[in-house]
């Protein structure tokens, strides 16, 4: 009997242990952020009713093993923030990924509002941490340097970017829902000043590289949505580098009903430009001040003001330029060089002023209304009168000879003069209303915008070329100019646009979301009405929540603005119609873990069909449009993005893209001429007498932004023994691009710019941490939160990439293309302090 009792006890104990070992589990993982979407480290995560738990990592991430097939709750708490709770019921082996936002305060155990993950379900959306804009090694810095990781680049001196075969004018930029604009007369990256977006003021960055919603405007390529921070306490920062200096302060007042956010920046690219191939006196300068103020009158009403005042000037007194390239052909192989001696000066000025006011009414917890009014002004002037005398020929690269570096076999000589006195003033007035209504699993959004744009410009620009004593083009008895643009314009453009959009989340078991919307735009200048339906769809399988499938389709039409309206001769085409495009995008988003570190892989395939296209040429960053709707085009490609912690607690990004974009111009043809022997007449043909001709239609050809392959990498690492010493790598690669020979139908976009390859490396070290309690009361650093020092190596590979070509003719009228190159390897140091 006793043995039987012992046996039963043993069996019960064994079965209990076996049952325990077979306990069903699931996984909850995610990220905890503050009200500005910045990650919070060391947040306590505890299962309700338990005594122990885990804490979030330095990147705010956590992973928690939880029981399956039963209800439970996780409690998130952090000093100075409201404690919140999230309830779950998960199936066995199910993985739930969430984002938790904590608000400052002392109230405890609120039912948390869990933010959705729109970057997974919305097509084309890339969420970017603005803090990385302060650490990424880049000559331009700022938010745009982060965007270039995903879309590629071919110019480290500009903050402009091209998305999926579009040009710089096809990108929307919003700051706090106000649309902002860039200067229009800028011809090269070295003339650019500060970007409008101040990363120190930025709280959230949402970048759409295609297929964006109806609530965004009428352009064909991308939308960048910037939301500035909402300060909760007093703080600020100051930084100093060889390129840029800045200061910002933020805080609250009137019992937290009033907030302020003010930033001041100053930038000079002199250190970058001093190493250019053209030597001389460079005096670039750019300064801006921005401020955001909010007043919370009561729980229902808030008033917001956003202002920006920016001034950029660029002065150049060129002296000498030495360009070199190699020519390989069956007829001729040599190192070709051009020596240019300059006389003259360039002085440009760009001023931007912006004021925006917004009143927001929270009618109830489900209905929010917003009224906005803004004024944006660009005032620009471009003045230069430069004469260049050049000698062109074979350059000696034999270091043993006294003629090393000199042109020893001249092929041509001449003189050219470039002159411009251009003035432009654009004022854009806008009044808008936006609304949002939450109704169960639906979010209705609508908006209406009235715009009035006043454009006044005076263009006086010409170029003269002289070769071997003859002015080109050569007309006996006449002095002719190779290029003349002389025009004035005084335009008053009125536009009205609006949208309505419904966002639907179906039953959780289906995992389906749907966004359907319609935009309209009426332009009084050409009396054109545009209707743009747009649709997005996503599906997250219930059994596999780490995978999301999504698709989007819609119309993305772009009404003409200042640059599109101007023809190549400077005249204005006010009857120009909008460029129209229909786009289809499909993709997937997959979350997974490698070594318990989170990763996310996003893949998208797209196709854009464009009609009423206005062809253009790009020279550096200057876009010259034909001013006519005389082409059709398409762009298609695949993009892949991998975001994850390749090194624990240090997020890195890898982006790869394949793309093709082509255009077909109306009536683009040329003639081949043949002599009596049937030989095609070229510059080397002996018999130049035309006996016959044949028409050749050009057909489809590469667009100026065509680039087959792009790759971007932003990688972060740190010392395993000390996370306060970090390294950051910014790597960009882009395959070759076409370049146009002006005035040539046969050789349109026929020149090839070599692949763009660039690596920037940065090292940063924490000089002072945020443990203020360890500092002495009389320490001059007692009020500082931290101090970081950085060393940056720009263009680590010392590869001088090509941005454009200088076209020169020799004595036999043969044209040679000599590349204009960008910056070499340079160093930069930076000091950043926060308080």
Task: Describe the function of each predicted region.
Residues 31-38, 44-48, 75-82, 91-135, ...:
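Short, acidic, small-residue-rich periplasmic hinge/interaction motif at the N-terminus
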Residues 237, 243-266, 279-319, 346-371:
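Transmembrane beta-barrel wall of Gram-negative outer-membrane proteins
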Residues 507-509, 607-609, 629-740, 832:
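Gram-negative outer-membrane beta-barrel transporters
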Residues 370-374, 578-651, 657, 663, ...:
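Membrane-embedded beta-barrel scaffold of Gram-negative outer-membrane proteins
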Residues 529, 542-585, 605-630, 730-744, ...:
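Surface-exposed extracellular loop regions of Gram-negative outer-membrane beta-barrel proteins
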Residues 732-742, 765-835:
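C-terminal beta-signal and adjacent terminal beta-strands/loops
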Residues 296-311, 344-526, 602, 653:
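Face-selective signature of the C-terminal outer-membrane beta-barrel domain
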Residues 82, 91-92, 96, 118-212, ...:
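Periplasmic N-terminal accessory/gating domains of Gram-negative outer-membrane beta-barrel systems
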């Amino acid at each position: 009997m006793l043995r039987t009792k012992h046996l039963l006890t043993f069996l019960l104990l064994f079965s209990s242990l076996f049952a325990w070992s077979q306990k069903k589990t699931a996984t909850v993982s995610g990220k905890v952020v503050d009200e500005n979407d910045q990650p919070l480290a060391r947040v306590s995560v505890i299962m309700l009713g338990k005594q122990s738990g885990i804490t979030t990592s330095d990147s705010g991430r956590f992973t928690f093993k939880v029981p399956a097939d039963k209800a439970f709750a996780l409690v998130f708490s952090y000093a100075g923030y409201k404690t919140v709770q999230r309830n779950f019921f998960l199936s066995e082996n199910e993985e739930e990924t969430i984002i938790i936002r904590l608000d400052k305060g002392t109230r405890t155990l609120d039912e948390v509002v869990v933010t959705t993950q729109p970057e997974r379900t919305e097509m084309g959306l890339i969420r970017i941490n603005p803090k990385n804009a302060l650490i990424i090694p880049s000559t331009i810095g700022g938010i745009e340097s982060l965007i270039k990781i995903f879309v590629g680049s071919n110019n480290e001196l500009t903050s402009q970017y091209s998305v999926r075969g579009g040009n710089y004018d096809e990108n929307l930029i919003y700051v706090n829902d106000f649309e902002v604009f860039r200067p229009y007369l800028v011809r090269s990256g070295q003339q650019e000043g500060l970007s409008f977006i101040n990363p120190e003021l930025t709280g959230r960055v949402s970048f759409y590289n295609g297929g964006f919603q109806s609530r965004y405007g009428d352009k064909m390529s991308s939308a960048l949505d910037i939301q500035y921070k909402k300060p909760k306490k007093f703080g600020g920062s100051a930084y100093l580098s060889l390129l840029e200096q800045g200061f910002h302060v933020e805080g609250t007042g009137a019992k937290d009903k009033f907030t302020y956010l003010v930033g001041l920046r100053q930038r000079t690219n002199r250190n970058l430009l001093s190493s250019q191939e053209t030597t001389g006196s460079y005096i670039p300068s750019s300064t801006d001040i921005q401020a955001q103020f909010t007043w919370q009158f009561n729980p229902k009403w808030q008033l917001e003001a956003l202002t920006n005042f920016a001034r950029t000037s660029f002065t150049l007194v060129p002296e000498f330029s030495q360009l070199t390239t190699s020519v390989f052909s069956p007829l001729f192989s040599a190192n070709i060089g051009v020596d240019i001696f300059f006389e003259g000066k360039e002085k440009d000025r760009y001023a931007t002023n912006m004021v925006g006011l917004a009143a927001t009414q929270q009618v109830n917890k489900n209905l929010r209304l917003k009224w906005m009014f803004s004024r944006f002004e660009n005032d620009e002037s471009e003045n230069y009168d430069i004469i260049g005398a050049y000698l062109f020929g074979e350059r000696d690269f034999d270091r043993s000879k006294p003629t090393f570096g000199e042109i020893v076999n001249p092929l041509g000589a001449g003189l050219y003069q470039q002159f411009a006195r251009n003035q432009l003033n654009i004022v854009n007035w806008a009044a808008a209303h936006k609304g949002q209504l939450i109704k169960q699993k639906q979010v209705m959004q609508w908006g209406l915008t009235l715009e009035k744009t006043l454009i006044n410009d005076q263009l006086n620009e010409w170029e003269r070329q002289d070769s071997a004593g003859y002015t080109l083009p050569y007309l006996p008895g006449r002095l002719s100019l190779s290029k003349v643009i002389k025009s004035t314009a005084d335009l008053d453009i009125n536009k009205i646009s609006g949208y309505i959009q419904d966002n639907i989340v179906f039953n959780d078991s289906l995992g389906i979301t749907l966004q359907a919307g319609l935009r309209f735009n009426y332009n009084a200048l050409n009396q054109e009405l545009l209707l743009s339906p747009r649709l997005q769809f996503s599906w997250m399988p219930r059994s596999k929540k780490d995978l999301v499938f999504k698709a989007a389709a819609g119309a993305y039409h772009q009404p003409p603005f200042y640059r599109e309206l101007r023809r190549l001769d400077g005249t204005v085409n006010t009857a120009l119609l909008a460029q129209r495009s229909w786009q289809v995008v499909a993709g997937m988003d997959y979350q997974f873990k490698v070594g318990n570190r989170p990763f996310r892989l996003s893949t998208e395939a797209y196709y854009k069909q464009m009609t009423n296209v206005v062809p253009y040429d790009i020279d550096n960053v200057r876009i010259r449009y034909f001013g006519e709707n005389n082409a059709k085009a398409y762009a298609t490609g695949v993009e892949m993005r991998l975001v994850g912690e390749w090194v624990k607690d240090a997020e890195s990004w890898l982006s790869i893209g394949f793309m093709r974009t082509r255009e077909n111009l109306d009536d683009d043809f040329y003639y081949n001429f043949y002599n009596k022997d049937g030989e095609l007449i070229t510059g080397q043909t002996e018999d130049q007498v035309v006996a016959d001709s044949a028409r050749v239609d050009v057909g489809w050809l590469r667009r100026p932004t065509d680039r087959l392959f792009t790759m971007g990498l932003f990688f972060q690492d740190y010392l395993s023994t000390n996370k306060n010493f970090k390294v950051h790598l910014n790597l960009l690669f882009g395959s070759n691009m076409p370049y146009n020979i002006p005035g040539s139908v046969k050789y349109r976009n026929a020149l090839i710019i070599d692949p763009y390859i660039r690596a920037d490396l940065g090292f940063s070290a924490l000089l002072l941490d945020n443990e203020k309690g360890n500092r002495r009361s009389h320490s001059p650093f007692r009020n500082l939160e931290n101090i970081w020092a950085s060393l940056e190596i720009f263009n680590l590979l010392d590869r001088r990439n090509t941005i454009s070509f200088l076209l020169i003719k020799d004595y036999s009228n043969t044209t040679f293309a000599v590349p204009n190159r960008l910056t070499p390897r340079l160093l930069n140091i930076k000091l950043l302090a926060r308080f």
